[in-house]
């Protein structure tokens, strides 16, 4: 999920910086409120020694320590203010995911791809868990050396963009319409050899912005998109918000519409699509895709 264009996008820098500053202000405000509410209503009759003892017992030695900025937010603020490299999604595209994160964070956020925007996603999900799945081990080393707090897994894909038509045909088979743990799926599109944590976590948001998919020999996002839908359907209850980037390309366009379903699509903004997929385990007999209603009537 590295930068796809060298062009400078100042609006994105402003947006990211503003978002992080808002998070910082909210965090500090909550910390101050919490600190104030934990103090006695009146200290008129307490001696200075008693006040110091009580303050120590409250576990918050000084106001400065209580309101210290989280490392993830300070790292993000410094990085995006000083960096000329901006995330590859536009202001409007990032806004789609941010609105959902504003409602759901802190949450479990799975991101296919590790890149220049990863620190932003982790910061917008402050207090939650953000896991990045990346195919390039050398790239993981570069990014995590700079930001060691980012959590990432190295994975290997066995597909190629040039085989996408065959994989689409395969995906229409009955085996690929069955909902199960991807590790037990009989569909060859399912990703089955990833770390156990990938399958066993209940993901609230999934972003598909990798693996590489801009040339015929690249792995492509066919399996990533299919598996994202399978993880969402196979969760015990609730729903999962799934985002797919680069839907201007044939693979991302066709595979997201087919396996995440047009009926589950909530929004498309630029090259980003947002789907909300409910648990299929919570209601038996739910079709793989919802029945689409002709809105022209």
From Swiss-Prot:
Catalytic activity entry: glucuronoxylan D-glucuronate + n S-adenosyl-L-methionine = glucuronoxylan 4-O-methyl-D-glucuronate + n S-adenosyl-L-homocysteine + n H(+)
Stated name of the protein: Glucuronoxylan 4-O-methyltransferase 3
UniProt-annotated location(s): Golgi apparatus membrane
Function: Methyltransferase catalyzing 4-O-methylation of glucuronic acid side chains on xylan.
UniProtKB keywords: Golgi apparatus, Membrane, Methyltransferase, S-adenosyl-L-methionine, Transferase, Transmembrane, Transmembrane helix
Any one GO cellular component localisation term in the record: Golgi apparatus
Listed EC numbers: 2.1.1.112
Gene3D superfamilies tied to this protein: Vaccinia Virus protein VP39
Organism: Arabidopsis thaliana (Mouse-ear cress)
Recorded phenotype for the gene knockout or disruption: No visible phenotype; due to the redundancy with GXM1 and GXM2. Reduced levels of methylated glucuronic acids. Gxm2 and gxm3 double mutants show reduced stem mechanical strength.
Membrane topology: Single-pass membrane protein
Similarity-based family: Belongs to the methyltransferase superfamily.
């Amino acid at each position: 999920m590295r930068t796809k264009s060298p062009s400078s996008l100042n609006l994105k820098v402003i947006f990211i910086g503003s978002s992080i500053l808002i998070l910082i202000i909210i965090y500090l405000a909550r910390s101050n409120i919490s600190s104030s509410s934990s103090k006695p209503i009146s200290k008129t009759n307490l001696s200075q020694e008693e006040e110091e003892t009580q303050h120590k017992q409250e576990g918050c030695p000084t106001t400065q320590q209580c309101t210290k900025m989280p490392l993830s937010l300070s790292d993000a603020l410094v990085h995006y203010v000083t960096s000329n490299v901006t995330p590859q999604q536009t202001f409007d595209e990032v806004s789609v995911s941010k609105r959902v994160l504003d409602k759901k964070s802190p949450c479990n956020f799975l991101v296919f791809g590790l890149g220049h925007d990863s620190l932003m996603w982790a910061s917008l999900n402050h207090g939650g868990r953000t896991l990045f799945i990346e195919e390039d081990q050398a790239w993981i080393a570069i990014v995590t050396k700079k930001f060691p707090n980012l959590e990432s897994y190295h994975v290997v894909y066995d597909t190629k963009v040039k085989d996408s038509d065959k994989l689409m045909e395969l995906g229409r088979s009955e085996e690929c319409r069955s909902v199960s743990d991807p590790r037990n799926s009989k569909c060859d599109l399912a990703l089955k050899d990833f770390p156990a944590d990938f399958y066993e976590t209940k993901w609230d948001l999934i972003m598909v912005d990798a693996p590489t998919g801009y040339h015929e020999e690249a792995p492509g996002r066919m399996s990533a998109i299919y598996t994202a839908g399978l993880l969402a359907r196979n969760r015990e209850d609730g729903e999962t918000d799934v985002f797919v980037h680069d839907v201007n390309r044939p693979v991302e366009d066709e595979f997201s519409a087919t396996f995440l379903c047009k009926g589950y699509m909530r929004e498309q903004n630029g090259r980003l699509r947002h789907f909300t997929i409910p648990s299929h385990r919570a209601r038996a007999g739910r079709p793989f895709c919802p029945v689409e209603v002709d809105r022209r009537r």
